[in-house]
Amino acid sequence: MTSTPLLSVVIPSYNYARFLGDCLTSIFNQTNAPPFEVVVVDDGSTDETPQVLEMYADPCLRVVRHDRNRGHVATVNEALGLARGTFIARIDPDDRYRPHFMSEICRVLADNPEVGFVYGRAALIDDRGVETGPITAAPHEGDFKGSEFIRLLEQNFVCAPASAGRREAWLEHVPVPAGLAFNDWYFSVLIARTYPFYFLDDVIADYRVHGANHHTKISKDGSEERSIFWLLDRVFEPQEDGFPFEPSREDVMRRVYGAHYLDLAEKYFGFGHNADARRCYLAAIRCRPSCLSDPGVARRFGATVLSRTMYDKTKALLGRGR
């Protein structure tokens, strides 16, 4: 094992044996890779995860196995604490890297010592590993270096497998609080509050969409909503040395809270959770009344107040061109 890896790749893993091999292969098949280590913390998997890890025995690979499941947040905290690299990247076992991921993110961080975090674009893949399209539109035209804090408060546009940061930037925010439903946005927002970011305008990772995605589960059960507003309440808590919000803290709060309530309303509407959708639409309208100028938003909000059945019938008729 390299005594001083430049990069640590940490993988919190639980019952993803069917995808883990693809993830590890993408790591060990990097081109022009710097000295690196891979830290896998297996959170008590009951599938073939141990057998998959044995197939990838390598001096660069360190494996920690829990005898019982301790939960995703505890596993992430442990994995980050074990990382020894100057830079750290975190990837879930169902995602994978493009061959130039390591060389590119390490180049950017080495060439820009003031930058705390680098992220690039990601492509969507299905459960078979077939690319299905881009995950989102690129947030910038070309490479970008600067503050992403306010933009990240409004929208989580950093795809976890397509990102990496300096060790100290990560560890300033470890441990992740127990009960937080996700940690990607937590790290992005809090690191962006202190450090400039660098956007690399290139596809450097693949994000897999499948039926067991963690994010879909937390969106449906409400834990995503609770975690979002826990973090926002913390960020906007008045502090003497706080971030200088412009034009004012209150204006930024209305914009940010409104954006998240609207996003949650649209998700709940898609899941058929009408009461939650209506509640979040109303909160979004209170924060940002202009969101009703979007005809689609207005129609969907109306459907939660009046009749979802009428909305579905109207949508079907319009879809047939009537």
In which residue ranges do the predicted regions lie?
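Conserved nucleotide-sugar donor-binding catalytic segment
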Residues: P139-I228
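Acidic helix N-cap motif at the loop->helix transition within catalytic regions
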Residues: G21, D47-M55, R96, H100
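Short, acidic, metal-binding catalytic loop of nucleotide-sugar glycosyltransferases
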Residues: T25-P35
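Flexible acidic/His/Gly-enriched loops in nucleotide-sugar-dependent glycosyltransferase catalytic domains
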Residues: H72-T75, S103-E172
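Glycine-rich, basic loop-to-helix element that forms the pyrophosphate-binding segment
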Residues: H66-A83, S147
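A conserved acidic beta->alpha catalytic loop
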Residues: S26, D42-Q51, R68, D92
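Short aromatic/hydrophobic "clamp" motif used to bind/position activated sugar donors
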Residues: I88
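C-terminal subregions of glycosyltransferases and related glycan-biosynthesis enzymes
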Residues: F157, L180-A181, Y186, R193, ...
